[in-house]
Regions:
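Hydrophobic transmembrane helix segments
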Residues: 17-49
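Membrane-helix boundary connector in multi-pass membrane proteins
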Residues: 76, 89-105
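Membrane-interfacial loop-to-transmembrane alpha-helix junctions, especially the N-terminal start
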Residues: 73-83
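Hydrophobic, membrane-inserted alpha-helices
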Residues: 58-66, 87-91, 114
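Cytosolic juxtamembrane helix and N-cap/initiation of the first transmembrane helix
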Residues: 1-19
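Aromatic-anchored segments of alpha-helical transmembrane domains
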Residues: 20-23, 83-93
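Core segments of alpha-helical transmembrane spans in multipass integral membrane proteins
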Residues: 46-67, 82
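Membrane-water interface at the C-terminal end of transmembrane alpha helices
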Residues: 113-127
């Protein structure tokens, strides 16, 4: 019975993860389509909620994983690296597609430096 429940939960969480991957792709690479499909205007209640939820929670997640890695150690290296790496990849692709802005370049450099620092710390701690 316990194993059945474990599998049901894994399937449920896996399906949610797939839905979130699709949603993340849509917001990252087709935001206009997503805004139009859901009738989201950025200065409406829904628009503000989406900005706060999608952007705010993503940044909170990155910050939390970075802090957990620094405080709690190696088991948080992979989540922190993946989160920062996804921000860097998405921002770089968006930069190539949508064009230049000095803030974008600053954030790309900062995210790359964070990744370098994560890998350097991981390497130093494994010696």
């Amino acid at each position: 019975m316990k194993n059945t429940f474990i599998w049901i939960l894994k399937i449920f969480i896996g399906l949610i993860a797939l839905l979130l991957l699709k949603t993340g792709f849509m917001w990252s690479f087709l935001p206009e389509t997503n805004l139009e499909a859901h009738n989201i205007v950025t200065n409406s209640n829904l628009g503000l909620n989406m900005i706060k939820s999608e952007i705010g929670s993503g940044l909170f997640s990155v910050a939390l994983f970075l802090l957990l890695y620094v405080i709690k150690g190696k088991k948080w290296f992979l989540p922190a690296t993946i989160m920062v790496g996804l921000y860097l990849v998405t921002r770089t692709i968006s930069f190539m597609v949508d064009g230049y802005h000095p803030v974008i370049v600053t954030l790309i450099v900062l995210e790359a430096l964070i990744l370098v620092a994560l890998f350097a710390l991981n390497k130093l701690q494994s010696k």
